[in-house]
Amino acid sequence: MVALTEKTEKRLTIQTADIAQDTTAIRSLDWERDRFDIEFGLQNGTTYNSFLIRGEQIALVDTSHEKFRQLYFDTLTGLINPTEINYLIISHTEPDHSGLVKDLLQMAPEITVVGSKVAIQFLEDLVHQPFKRKIVKNGDRLDLGNGHEFEFVIAPNLHWPDTIFSFDHKTQTLYTCDAFGMHYCSDIVFDEDLKTIEPDFHYYYDCLMGPNARSVLSALKRMGELPSVKMIATGHGPLLYHNVEELTGRYRTWSQNQTKAETSIGVFYVSEYGYSDRLAQAIINGITKTGVGVDVVDLGAAVDLQELRELVGRCTGLVIGMSPAASAASIQGALSTILGSVNEKQAVGIFETGGGDDEPIDPLLSKFRNLGLTTAFPAIRIKQTPTENTYKLCEEAGTDLGQWVTRDRSIKAMKSLGADLDKALGRLSGGLYIITAKKGDVSSAMLASWVNQASFKPLGFSIAVAKDRAIESLMQVGDRFVLNVLEEGNYQPLMRHFLKRFAPGADRFEGVKTQPAENGAPILGDALAYMECEVVSRMDCGDHWAVYSTVYAGRVSKSEALTAVHHRKVGNHY
């Protein structure tokens, strides 16, 4: 049975569904959520999933976002008297899943909270009231009766340090919270249409799970010790039932590829201080676009200094988030270990975390410079609440760092192509275009020549977009942009401008005549023609995305003029 409330003005709804024996999903549907965490440019909203399991005793797995407080508790109390709930299982303490824990404990103070040791510690700081607790370790079990025996899997860093999975042996359902989820809002409970959801599934992995690929593989190994998993009840998006093996297999493949990366960058910061998590995640997103592996270390957690020393030694680059000035001795010890383990061949980037009490950034930056490290991007200084542009700046800074540490590899790859084949590929020619895009307050642009019409009905074309281009994150499925066509004999000024290497966060359109298209993207005043377009699909082509888009509007400024053509002599670069 599925029940769905009427959609409110803000398009926040609650859906309940019986998903297995004695098991009800309570899904908080946020239809218009256009951003989540950092770089999720959502087109399809998101959901926050909670689950009620009734054995001889009753357990609730996770709660919801605080914005759903009234809707969630109206729904929960319609299903059960909260005082009848025996256990609240906390998958992790991120506010979008635990935002209503304090309210629930006030309604039902006899509930026993079940979670990892770290989760219980975090929760004490969130609820500020005594509560019953049960700390679980990997392999521990909780018997609700009537066959509902829960087994717990410790899965740290997916994507919070306190994460656990919970497996119900009776229904063979694995509750994973963020892992295997996606930001996709639909009243279709399960993964029935894989083709529709897989772009969001992949993008979610890239943003949140990819930077913790080793932790993903560890969790998958522990999952392998469980009996067959029939369903994965995720914290976001549709539940996995029809494609469990396929989608867990993709996680394994993607994570194995990440850990095989020839180069890696260490990202070090104090989680849950200021905006550190969000800023670090944006930088990580930029790094991973370059194909570089990432090792994330929370300096606020227990850190083995020998392991830290070894990690720093094998990294080709480092990112440091400024810690609180009054930070614990363990954090200062970890920073001293990092400084004592670096070498002059490495690159470094530093960002303020905006916690209001950051250590000064310049003394630490000077120490790294004095040790001979290259500064890969200008220090990121946070003087006010970060905006979309701040996070875009962070992403671009991460990409700059990733490109710096892979520069030798890129040159080697260019030289590896046979001379004859290189020259033959160079005879493939294309027009010259500028892609412009704008989403919210963030805008970007890219010079392109790999553009080809792909269909008549609908009118569509393909563009090859390198994965490490700044504009790539603005060209997800559903995003809109403008294709500006450059004119033969009049393309040099625009081409020279957009070929410049822009600093992270720089305005690509400064000094360029533009006007806004209906979709908000800039139309270049000196372009020969323009087309307004929407991304329909993307195909992974190694170091590029082949982006197929449809065209719904366009104009030509000079009917007799021709498109500028880019003639190459070799095929190993643009």
Curated annotation (Swiss-Prot):
Fe cation 2 binds at residues 96, 178, 236. Residues 410-574 are annotated as: Flavodoxin-reductase-like. Binds 2 iron ions per subunit. SUPFAM superfamilies: Flavoproteins, FMN-binding split barrel, Metallo-hydrolase/oxidoreductase. Keywords: Electron transport, Iron, Metal-binding, Oxidoreductase, Transport. Fe cation 1 binds at residues 92, 94, 159, 178. Gene3D superfamilies: 3.40.50.360, Electron Transport, Fmn-binding Protein, Chain A, Ribonuclease Z/Hydroxyacylglutathione hydrolase-like. Residues 43-236 are annotated as: Zinc metallo-hydrolase. InterPro entries: Flavin_Rdtase-like_dom, Flavodoxin/NO_synth, Flavoprotein-like_sf, Metallo-B-lactamas, NADH_oxidoreductase_modular, ODP_dom, RibonucZ/Hydroxyglut_hydro, Split_barrel_FMN-bd. It comes from the Bacteria. GO terms for molecular function: FMN binding; metal ion binding; oxidoreductase activity, acting on the CH-NH group of donors, NAD or NADP as acceptor. Its EC number is 1.-.-.-. Its cofactor is Fe cation. Mediates electron transfer from NADH to oxygen, reducing it to water. This modular protein has 3 redox cofactors, in other organisms the same activity requires 2 or 3 proteins. In the N-terminal section; belongs to the zinc metallo-hydrolase group 3 family. By homology with NorV in E.coli, could be involved in nitric oxide detoxification. This is Putative diflavin flavoprotein A 3. It comes from Nostoc sp. (strain PCC 7120 / SAG 25.82 / UTEX 2576).
